[in-house]
Amino acid sequence: MIDDNSKEFIKRHIGPSEEDQSKMLQYVGYKSLEDLMSNTVPEKILLKDDLKIDQPMSENDALKKLKSISKKNKIFKNFIGMGYYNSITPNVILRNILENPGWYTSYTPYQPEVAQGRLEMLLNFQQSIIDLTGMDIANASLLDEATATAEAVGLSQRLDKTNSKKIFISSNCNPQTIDLIKTRTNPFGLELIIGDEKKELSKINEDIICGVLSYPGTLGEINDPSESISQIHKKNGKAILVCDLLALARLKTPAELGADIAVGSAQRFGIPMGCLLYTSPSPRDRYGSRMPSSA
């Protein structure tokens, strides 16, 4: 618990004091805080009961209490998937990056891109994405897979010369990816056609801005998307392939399949869930001037 000396320190240094409050209330014409609140806050949103707040605690006591609460958690295995996979972070990364104070100290030397090796790190990241996807260029980078896919759709819209308002999205994409594309395209009045690419693409008889396919699908199935990519191109659309980068170590690259833009989350490579996900759209070189920059 907090001792009397600490309470005195709090009273002196954390205001406003009771005297300050009295002066301020007198200035605005109210007798008490309750009088002020009743005349400024609508009654219907006021709490009827007093807040149940325990006595103040020191930092150590608070940490002990939080740890005791956390021990009540039950830890289960995670089988959710859908773009989020638990992974083991290699010790070399933990030791040399996450535990290296040079990355998070308050003082940053001049030209941190050189002094801390950031430019080299980003260059290596981009080259790895290019190697895995087979694309000509890669950025470094965006946020999660859903955001990167929405950016790829935006890139396709900027490149579109058909004035189309239609976008095809495979129902095999992760649900959060589909939802984010809906949110980002709604202000532009674009029409989303969501369904099985093997059935729905052939029914579209007009130009589309782009088609978004998942490789592998959200449930893990691996299908050859080359025929669907060909159909998207016949409708003058850009083929966007949402990839599992780890799977691309064994599967055909998006470039070999004919995709125009590839996106995928790097969370698979030892990044704990809950951290920033670095995701890179890797379009053909001719689209480079229109692609989104790093975020």
What spans do the regions from the language model cover?
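Active-site core of PLP-dependent enzymes with the aminotransferase class I/II
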Residues: 216-235, 246-253
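Short gly/pro/ser/thr-enriched loop/turn and capping motifs at secondary-structure boundaries
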Residues: 174-175, 247-249, 268-273
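PLP-dependent aspartate aminotransferase-fold enzymes
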Residues: 88-102, 106-202, 206-207
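Conserved active-site segment immediately N-terminal to the catalytic lysine
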Residues: 36, 255-272
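Charged, compositionally biased N-terminal leader segments and the immediate start
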Residues: 1-16
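N-terminal entrance/gating region of PLP-dependent enzymes' catalytic architecture
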Residues: 16, 39-124, 130
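Conserved small/polar residues in nucleotide/adenosyl-binding loops
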Residues: 278-285
